[in-house]
Swiss-Prot record:
It is an enzyme of class 2 (transferase). One of its GO terms (molecular function) is transcription cis-regulatory region binding. It comes from Homo sapiens (Human). Sequence-specific DNA-binding transcription factor. Represses transcription at least in part by recruitment of the histone methyltransferase EHMT2/G9A and histone deacetylases such as HDAC1. Regulates hematopoiesis-associated protein-coding and microRNA (miRNA) genes. May regulate the expression of proteins involved in extracellular matrix development and maintenance, including fibrillar collagens, such as COL4A1 and COL11A1, connective tissue components, such as HAPLN1, and molecules regulating cell migration and adhesion, including EDIL3 and TGFB2. Residues 8-124 form the SET domain. One of its GO terms (biological process) is cellular response to leukemia inhibitory factor. Pfam families: PRDM2_PR (PF21549), zf-C2H2 (PF00096), zf-C2H2_6 (PF13912), zf-met (PF12874). This is PR domain zinc finger protein 5.
């Protein structure tokens, strides 16, 4: 299942155009930015029928315009965060359009979108295409536009999915497949209710214009009232059920009478009746009608195939926030499982290597690496793998294909996630501000680490071998490998071993030539972000490291450390031949050349005198021959 992870630059809130959650911008989005790809199950067009909900479906076409398949994101287990982008009520309100690249669907910003704006999808019309040609967005659109398969897209669904939308709304541009759906649309969005038609909450008296809004409110209102009225809850003397409000209790009493001993178990009904015949009549009248009408979500009107699937679907309208990192989940179980990642406890150990884990299932998955059975063999290097996903990731290290390109610096990446992570370096907006100082950050987790390290001096994970402390347990585990010499990660190009995936990843760039970190001032690129940061200081002349003795400043910490030795007289680099000591390692290396009988000598072209170092030769030519080095 694809988790409902939402990138930091977006947030989930109640939609302004439909019931349920919508996707909003957490920062300004520029025209031409692209998001995706859209995730969903692949379905063939012939598997669809006109009773299905098309709002979360996209059609994927081949090079000749033929329909290859339908991407269906109806099931949250097979979708991603783009499922929360709703159809724009009209073309004027859209700020995104769908495009197809290869067999992937992406969402393209067709205008600059301000912060805290709901993202609404539409289709590209001819005016939009002409405007794109003028403003270079066509560099993003390589395979042509994708038509919208959602319910309100009148230009898309008529030709592709065989559903005629003959019932047009007189208030907006929407059209629908039946008069009943049109009537529901008018009542929900356009009709102002009369006093007698308002839907009123029996708990608090609050009124709502539509029934769906009331149903959502009741879930929250009942939970609040249960806390306030827990001391005076209402309990049924027949079945011992408790209720937080008198109205709910009275409604229950009508169905739960002492003389009603026949219980209806259909669809979790629970109604009690006096006789077997009454139960039979009830089931025929209530539970054997048109099943399609009973399996419709009251929030988004999605039609489900069974009561259990409807119950599962309703969970997507409940969003559970992690209070530690603000990630969002669609079920309490997912959130509970995620919270383990924030815990310091690792109670489950592997009895073979004593490695500890936070979850028992992780131990089971880990034990496979100790088994000799490694069914996934790499055909290129012969390396075996116990897990299929690890094998698939390994195969990518042999591939030169990088289909995902950054539009800012043209860097290429193998996966959408790698590209998305890289794009953070181009985002100039830092939305997370430290309350202790003026520092700002692009991600909240980076801000949290800053506060812990700088302001709280909070490094609670300490190495028992060297007493060095770290902010997170993962960094401590990586550090410990420097003591044990453990190097599990092997470079597929040269066989060199590394202690962590991060150092291996940086090393592999020396083989592939990948330099994803581009200098904004010049054309120079770097394989590591630290290298880029230090290089940028050559443009900005920034020297943040100052000597406390003489106020001399340096652009790198290493330069400051070397300079301090001129004040302390410390010379930690000693020659093992003649015991001379030096303050810098490069000075020791240069000195050792004098002990090498086979060393290359620098020769004067005028008098053929030889010198052990080039700088000695330069001084000689300047003083003796009057030739300055150019």
């Amino acid at each position: 299942m694809l988790g409902m992870y939402v990138p930091d630059r977006f947030s989930l809130k109640s939609s302004r155009v439909q019931d349920g959650m919508g996707l909003y911008t957490a920062r300004r989005v520029r025209k031409g930015e692209k998001f995706g790809p859209f995730a969903g199950e692949k379905r063939m067009p012939e598997d669809l029928d006109e009773n299905m909900d098309y709002r979360l479906m996209w059609e994927v076409r081949g090079s000749k315009g033929e329909v290859l398949y339908i991407l269906d994101a109806t099931n949250p287990r097979h979708s991603n965060w783009l499922r929360f982008v709703h159809e724009a009520p009209s073309q004027e309100q859209k700020n995104l359009a769908a495009i197809q690249e290869g067999e992937n669907i992406f969402y393209l910003a067709v205008e600059d979108i301000e912060t805290d704006t709901e993202l609404l999808i539409g289709y590209l019309d001819s005016d939009m295409e002409a405007e794109e040609e003028e403003q270079q967005i066509m560099t993003v659109i390589k395979e042509g536009e994708v038509e919208n398969s959602r319910r309100q897209s009148t230009a898309g669904r008529k030709d592709r999915l065989g559903c005629k939308e003959d019932y047009a709304c007189p208030q907006c541009e929407s059209s629908f497949t039946s008069e009943d759906i049109l009537a529901e649309h008018l009542q929900t969005l356009h009709q102002k209710p009369t006093e007698e038609k308002e839907f009123k909450c029996k708990n608090c008296g609050k009124k709502f214009p539509v029934k769906q809004a009331l149903q959502r409110h009741v879930l929250q209102c009942t939970a609040k009232s249960s806390l306030k009225e827990s001391s005076r809850s209402f309990q049924c003397s027949v079945c011992n059920s408790s209720f937080s409000s008198a109205s709910s209790f009275e409604q229950h009493q009508e169905t739960c009478r002492g003389d009603a001993r026949f219980v209806c178990k259909a669809d979790s009904c629970g109604k009690r009746l006096k006789s077997k015949d009454a139960l039979k009549r009830h089931q025929e009248n209530v539970h054997t009608g048109d099943p399609k009408k009973k399996l419709i979500c009251s929030v988004c009107n999605k039609k489900c195939s069974s009561a259990s699937s409807l119950q599962e679907h309703r969970k997507i309208h409940e969003i559970f926030d992690c209070q530690e990192c603000m990630k969002k989940f669609i079920s309490a179980n997912q959130l509970k499982r995620h919270m383990i990642t924030h815990s310091e406890k690792r109670p489950y150990n592997c009895e073979i290597c004593n490695k500890s884990f936070k979850r028992l299932d992780q131990v089971g998955a880990h034990k496979v690496i100790h088994s000799e059975d490694k069914p996934y063999k790499c055909k290129l290097c012969g390396k075996g793998f116990a897990h299929r996903n690890v094998y698939k990731n390994h195969k990518k290290t042999h591939s030169e294909e990088r289909p995902f390109q950054c539009e800012e610096c043209k860097a290429l990446f193998r996966t959408p996630f790698s590209l998305q992570r890289h794009l953070l370096i181009h985002n100039s907006e830092r939305t997370f501000k430290c309350h202790h100082c003026d520092a700002t950050f692009k991600r909240k987790d980076t801000l949290n680490v800053h506060v812990q390290v700088v302001h709280e001096r909070h490094k609670k994970y300490r190495c028992e071998l060297c007493n060095k402390a770290f902010v997170t347990p993962s960094v401590l585990r990586s550090h410990k490998k420097t003591h044990t010499g453990e190097k599990e990660k092997i470079c597929p190009y040269c066989g060199q071993k590394f202690a962590s995936s991060g150092t291996l990843r940086v090393h592999i760039r020396s083989h592939t030539g990948e330099r994803p970190y581009q200098c904004p001032y010049c054309e120079k690129g770097f394989s590591k972000n630290d290298g880029l940061k230090m290089h940028i200081r050559t443009h900005t002349r920034e020297k943040p490291y100052k000597c406390s003795e003489c106020s001399k400043a340096f652009s790198q910490k290493r330069g400051l450390d070397e300079h301090k030795r001129t004040h302390t007289g410390e010379k930690p680099f000693q020659c093992d031949v003649c015991d001379l000591a030096f303050s810098l390692k490069k000075m020791l290396i240069r000195h050792k050349m004098t002990h090498n009988p086979n060393r290359p000598l620098a020769e004067c072209q005028f008098c053929h005198k030889k010198f052990t170092r080039n700088d000695y030769l330069k001084v000689h030519m300047d003083n003796i021959h009057g030739v300055a080095d150019s």
